[in-house]
């Protein structure tokens, strides 16, 4: 059963990015969010002219000599909506809800 609990960091941040329109070729606002998250967290953050972002996090104490880990993701979202939806992916946040154990976005 899906429990979308905003007290959990992964739910909180997923909810935050769902408020930011970020369709393909419209990634600047989500790139701003991710880049600023890195800076505000005190992490070395790099952004290029294509909105690619690298955020560096030093190893935790005791793991300084371990192999590095890289997580890679894309910032854009495929924008598909139901035929009866008036959702505007350029300006509207996603309206998240849980139904039958699945996290969904209303109208999409």
Model-derived features: positions:
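Generic hydrophobic segment detector
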Residues: 13-16, 47, 52, 102-108
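Active-site metal-coordination/substrate-binding segment of hydrolases
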Residues: 63-108
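N-terminal capping segment at the start of a domain
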Residues: 2-25
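Short glycine-centered, acidic/aromatic-flanked micro-motifs in structured strand/loop junctions
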Residues: 20-22, 57, 73, 107
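Intrinsically disordered, low-complexity boundary segments flanking structured domains
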Residues: 4, 41, 82-85
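A non-catalytic alpha/beta surface segment that caps or lines the substrate-entry region
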Residues: 23-69
């Amino acid at each position: 059963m899906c429990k979308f609990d905003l007290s959990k960091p992964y739910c909180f941040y997923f909810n935050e990015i769902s408020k930011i329109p970020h369709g393909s070729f419209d990634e600047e606002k989500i790139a701003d969010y991710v880049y600023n998250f890195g800076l505000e967290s005190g992490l070395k953050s790099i952004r290029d002219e294509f909105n690619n972002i690298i955020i560096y996090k030093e190893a935790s104490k005791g793991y300084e000599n371990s192999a590095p880990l890289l997580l890679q993701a894309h910032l854009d979202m495929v924008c598909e909506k139901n035929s009866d939806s008036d959702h505007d992916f350029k300006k509207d946040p996603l309206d998240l809800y849980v139904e039958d154990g699945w996290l969904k976005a209303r109208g999409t």
